[in-house]
Amino acid sequence: MALSRRDFVKLCSGTVAGFGVSQMFHPAIHEAFAQTLTGERPPVFWVQGQGCTGCSVTLLNSTHPSIADVLLKIISLEFHPTVMAAEGEGAYEHMMRVAEKFKGKFIFAVEGAVPVAHDGKCCVVAEADHHEVTMTEVTKVLAANAAAVLAVGTCAAYGGIPAGKGNETGAMGVSAFLKKEGIPAPVINIPGCPPHPDWIVGTIGLGLQALATNTLGLLVKQGLDANGRPKAFYKNVHMNCPHLSAFEAGHMVKTMSDKDGCRFSMGCKGPRSACDSFER
């Protein structure tokens, strides 16, 4: 049964509250989500580079709203190698046609790192006119014309495992790659291995809200932290830890089996970590 606009706004209210988004964002995100029911859904292109597809799997596990609602009611997913029925040259050409039609109005999501070594041949995402289209080519074209770029997962955000020392592919994160190419696209990092589905869907909501109100620049400048992550979802773990008082009192555990005390002495990276796991 199709959701009414009123029902969907109610659904989004519960959803965004679950995201932990500050109250100042709630009405706008609700409206941005709800507008997609009666208005034109923004095109989204999801391209996969060097990764394990884990970020796609976590997105498919979204429950509030369900992935069906996300794909069929909130966005228009025009390209995603894992879930789309189309394939081959036809699917790629469709993506490029839609990207041209909605230039400056679509969302470009990248999963996986971007390999630049060996002319980018380490990751071929399509073939057109007997030409192998590399991840580097697609990223440059789509990022330059996107309203916003979402770097989904740690590999896309910062390079992740593919960019580890000794890699032969020259893998790098999306932001670093675009900076190297001189492409000033607004990038929102959603790190995690994999990121929680709420972070992905919630960031899409923030993006829709910013696009609808022409405040994308403000979101990028004020809504992201120093590492390009949405502040709404990447809060400091240490400051929200149930053992914070023990840390401040200098009460440290001596073994991992100790029930009481702060785990910092055992190597906890809470003070340097950011995510809202304490709310999940």
What are the residue ranges of the model-derived segments?
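A conserved mid-domain beta-alpha-beta active-site/ligand-binding segment of alpha/beta enzyme cores
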Residues: 201, 205-280
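Disulfide-bonded cysteines in secreted/extracellular proteins and peptides
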Residues: 12, 52-55, 155, 193, ...
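N-terminal secretory signal peptides
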Residues: 1-3, 31-33
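Short Gly/aromatic-enriched secondary-structure transition segments
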Residues: 59-65
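N-terminal export signals
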Residues: 7-30
